[in-house]
Amino acid sequence: MEVGRFASKSASMTYLLLVLLVGFILPQQGQHAHARTLARRDNSPTDICKRWSQQTAIVNGTLYIYGGRSTTDASQKDNTWNDNFLTLDLKSSWGISAPKLTGLPRGDNGPPPVSNGYLWNSFSSLFLYGGEFSDNPATEPVDFSLWEYSIPSSSWIEHKSPKTSSGENSAEANIPVQRSAEGAGINVPDLGRGWYFGGHLDGYTTKGWSQSIPRVYLKSMIEYTFPGHTNNGVKINTDDKRAGPEGVWRNITEGGLQDSAGFTERADGVLVYIPGFGKEGIILGLAGGTNATFTQMNVIDVFDIASSKWYKQATSGKTPKIRVNPCAVAASAADGSSTQVYLFGGQNLIPYGEQIQYNDMWILSIPSFTWIEAKTDGQSVPPARAGHTCNIWNSQIVVTGGYVGQDLSCDSPGIYVFDASELTWKNQYTALEGGNDLNQQASQTRDSSGLGGSYGYRVPKVVQSVIGGDETGKATQTVPAVAPTDGPLATGQPLTYTVLPTAGSGPHAGSPGSGSDGPNIAAIVAGVIAGCLGVLAIYLGFVTWLYRRRLAIYKSHLAATQRSSIGSYGDKISSFPPRYSDHMSSSGLGTTGSTGNLTVTTARMSWISGDNQRHNHTRSSSGGNFDHLAQPERPSTSSSVEDLLAGQEPTFLGVMLNPRQTLRVINQ
């Protein structure tokens, strides 16, 4: 009985456990499965251990960071490729220990996880080109698509299976565009174009490429014309000659020196845009190489955008060591007379297995093409790195990520700031007020060709000492130190601008976020003072002229008085010439004059007896002779020389304080 009761209870307990399993545990498992689905749509994480080989772009004060490779802890060795999509706010200030990163949604509706591609940008969109897929674990690439991110709608758009169009110095039309990786990218939003130079193709970039086939390095340049923009170098099959919604592609393979033996294949280099010289500006290609050779730094490849041709230009000065995977940006002097290219970091892979990373900063000043090392000894310089990205805003270079080798366990958050004007590494980014959407120099805002990111930039003193001029520009070295033989550098010149005198607007000029393009009290006060001094100088000049005229009249009057006295032997004072109509002061002149041996003293001269009496005399309307003694009358232009005839020599102060009376005297 007890056994049966126990068995009954045992069965009841079993049933209860089954109910709990079905009613609680299984739903929880279902919730976890749904959570994994949602996690795929969660915002991208901002906390990492290391980050490198990502793609970045700035649009209107926001830095966008997509994909690349990252680890979450020091022990992670695989699964480093990611599709994280982040923004970094450059419109407000922050410290490098806590940059203002925001994770954007990621999911199945966006690009695949790739690294070492490039993020072009227009004024409202991002365009992700190229990149390679994971090699650990090995991942088969998908067919190439250009991925466009619409900033206004916060959504990704896939442009599938693009093909080339025919154009100048380019390959034939209707060739499928390939995905390359580790090339050098650049874009010019005002032109509505992006470029990707060199790189490589292999089994991690191209679908169907066998891993047994060696990597192929490139020296071609792929060009993409953004939707809605024009491009005279490529055939556009629309009535208005503007690219359609899919854009237009061109593969430039025969531009100038590009098809010559001296123009080598390369990957892991950088491109920099320089306004001026050609009709649409020029692009510089620096650094990079292959698994066997490196590109030298004493000769720079120069691409003329308008003619789609490559040239070479020799440099001067001590050159940086050969390297791959550096980063580079450009900043323009306020007057445009010089542009400085900043090149940071990179690595040397030769000999194989003994790679070394760099953390040095170099400046290539254009148009002199002179290398200048930016000394940063004693500063908090970031650890040496390669595969990082650089972007410039408010004349501050923002360095993101980078491969730092095996000795450093983590490099978090891995974002650093370099002041391009002061040549110093900072512990914070400083937002400036009063800029513009393109962040151009204030003197260049009316010209769409002005270089973005240069707002507040001042030419460093070490650069001034080499190219001449001052912090606003005025470079005296306006041509390459090694004379060019051909191309836009031989025939063109930089775009220059007029710089109005203003207070500095660089990050050194005020507290974070204070800016300098708002009301500037010092500038206003200086302007007011300068204006007042200018008015005062004009007035004093006018008073000086009045004083001299009146003094001359006084001396003429005095001489006439003396001649009259001499003519009467001192018996009486004859009438003044008709032009004078007022009385002499009872105080007299106390003046002694002499003619030959005759000395005449005219003292205390008055029209009537009595030292303290003052009267006005009127003259006839004809102005011929003095009339009889009359009653005092209101001052008028007909009786305008009281002070002069009062016997007092005019003073400069008196004329300055009463210029109207002096004018009446002169006009009479």
From Swiss-Prot:
Q: Which Gene3D superfamilies match?
A: Kelch-type beta propeller
Ranges: Kelch repeats: 62-108, 125-176, 283-331, 340-395, 396-445, 463-509
Q: Where is the signal peptide?
A: 1-32
Instruction: Give the main localization category.
Output: membrane
Residues covered by region (Disordered): 611-642
Pfam families noted in UniProt:
Kelch_KLHDC2_KLHL20_DRC7
Compartments annotated for it: namely: Membrane; Secreted
Q: Which residues are glycosylated?
A: 60, 251, 291
Q: Which residues lie on this side of the membrane: Extracellular?
A: 33-522
Membrane side Cytoplasmic: residue ranges: 544-668
Q: Give the domain of life.
A: Eukaryota
What keywords is this UniProt entry annotated with?
A: Glycoprotein, Kelch repeat, Membrane, Repeat, Secreted, Signal, Transmembrane, Transmembrane helix
Write the protein's name: Kelch repeat-containing protein ARB_01230
Question: Which organism's genome codes for this protein?
Answer: Arthroderma benhamiae (strain ATCC MYA-4681 / CBS 112371) (Trichophyton mentagrophytes)
